[in-house]
């Protein structure tokens, strides 16, 4: 359905590259736009905070009732990791998700008519950072966030004293592993569909369409392009997809009485416990950068192409996750989020994956360097200084060529969209 998105341009509709990312499917897991300890949710009878005001109240009430942990450590409302590139994940990205309800397009927002905006230029994000500044001055945001290392950040999470995060699970996961090893599942994190206000919709489950820009192609120096095409053709076939996603029948998977694929408990444990499972078995090893189906897409037999499906995700839930699903009367944690069918799939692919000219990248890098330090300054300054600090950042971004970068990216997006329409 999205094959045309692979076209190079309107003037040159050739396809030089296949996508390295999954086509179609459903999202069964998400970190949400923010994360909150299960213990906090339980104390609030599993009420889900959906706005910043509700989130703030819940944090303040819990800190008032539990100023220290059982280990005697001061409770921290939430913390951030901003000493290196992680600032984009914990300080930058959540602003777009929460304030603008925007999907992940890196440092950019795409407005009406496919016009690009450097996201910190957004009025809504100004208000989001104003809230961050307020949380810092009231002691809810960790006063050490701006000076700590990423290792410090993970250690605080592992201590169980941090009630909330604005992050993604692959980043804070090492801290959670320590908590789980200590049996402190209540101190691990629930994904939340948090937004700035009731009028903003959390975009976590939004399908952004086929990701193009990163992928696999055949070079002009390829000695046997016919063989390469045959290989790609096989990888994309039903047989090829089952082989790379599931492995070998009778070894890595079996068929039930209805002819549907399943894995034994031992195989599932092997796949999750052995970090070299993919290399040893080949299962999942050839997914990236080759084309593959997304989760829940079914083959002609009614089996899913991937091993990740609704049932496997539910079976993997821990005690806290199962209790929450029961309290919410849902099957999946993602059921409390705005669903994918509530959103329109954009005409463009995720912007972060697009190839961009060197001139654009040079300006964009300057913009990010300015925003990195300036946003931290905005957050840690006094509430009275906030607007002046934010205005200075916008002025510095404009002087660094923000308008030129926005125009260049707008032209790239509109050219890509024109190739499809």
Role assignments for model-derived ranges:
Residues 169-182:
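A ligand-binding cleft/hinge motif common to bilobed small-molecule-binding domains
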Residues 9-87, 110-156, 161, 165-168, ...:
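Helix-loop-helix "hinge/cap" segment bordering the ligand-binding cleft or interdomain interface
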Residues 240-373, 380:
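Conserved small-residue motifs centered on glycine
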Residues 373-421:
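Histidine-centered catalytic/metal-binding microenvironments
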Residues 1-32, 89-128, 132, 180-209, ...:
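Hinge/lid segment of periplasmic solute-binding proteins
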Residues 100, 119-128, 358-373, 388, ...:
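Short, 15-30-residue, compositionally biased linear elements
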């Amino acid at each position: 359905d999205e094959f045309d998105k692979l076209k190079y341009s309107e003037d040159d509709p050739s396809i030089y590259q296949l996508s390295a990312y999954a086509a179609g499917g459903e999202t069964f897991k998400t970190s949400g736009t923010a994360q909150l300890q299960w213990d906090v949710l339980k104390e609030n009878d599993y009420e889900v905070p959906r706005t910043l005001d509700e989130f703030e109240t819940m944090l303040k009430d819990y800190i008032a009732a539990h100023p220290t942990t059982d280990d005697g450590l001061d409770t921290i409302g939430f913390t951030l990791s901003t000493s290196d590139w992680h600032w984009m994940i914990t300080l930058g990205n959540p602003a777009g998700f929460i304030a603008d309800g925007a999907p992940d397009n890196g440092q950019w927002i795409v407005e009406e008519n496919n016009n690009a905006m450097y996201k910190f230029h957004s009025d809504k994000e100004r208000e989001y950072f104003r809230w961050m500044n307020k949380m810092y001055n009231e002691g809810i945001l960790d006063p050490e966030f701006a000076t700590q290392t990423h290792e410090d950040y993970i250690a605080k999470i592992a201590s169980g004293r941090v009630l909330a995060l604005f992050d993604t699970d692959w980043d804070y996961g090492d801290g959670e592993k320590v908590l789980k090893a200590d049996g402190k599942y209540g101190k691990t994190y629930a994904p939340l569909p948090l937004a700035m206000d009731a009028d903003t919709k959390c975009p976590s489950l939004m399908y952004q369409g086929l990701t193009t820009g990163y992928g696999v192609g055949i070079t002009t120096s390829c000695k046997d392009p016919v063989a390469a095409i045959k290989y790609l053709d096989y990888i994309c076939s039903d047989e090829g997809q089952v082989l790379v996603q599931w492995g070998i029948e009778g070894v890595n998977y079996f068929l039930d009485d209805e002819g549907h694929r399943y894995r034994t408990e031992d195989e599932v444990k092997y796949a999750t416990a052995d970090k070299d499972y993919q290399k040893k078995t080949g299962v999942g090893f050839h997914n990236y950068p080759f084309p593959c189906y997304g989760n829940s897409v079914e083959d002609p037999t009614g089996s899913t192409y991937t091993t990740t499906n609704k049932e496997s995700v539910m079976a993997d839930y821990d005690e806290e996750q199962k209790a929450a699903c029961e309290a919410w009367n849902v099957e999946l944690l993602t059921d409390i989020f705005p669903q994918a069918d509530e959103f329109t799939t954009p005409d463009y692919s995720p912007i972060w994956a697009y190839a961009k000219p060197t001139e654009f990248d040079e300006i964009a890098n300057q913009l990010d360097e300015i925003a990195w330090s300036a946003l931290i300054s905005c957050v840690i300054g006094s509430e009275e200084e906030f607007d002046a600090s934010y205005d200075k950042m916008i002025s510095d971004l404009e002087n660094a060529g923000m308008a030129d970068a926005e125009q260049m990216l707008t032209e790239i997006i509109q050219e890509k969209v024109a190739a499809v329409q």
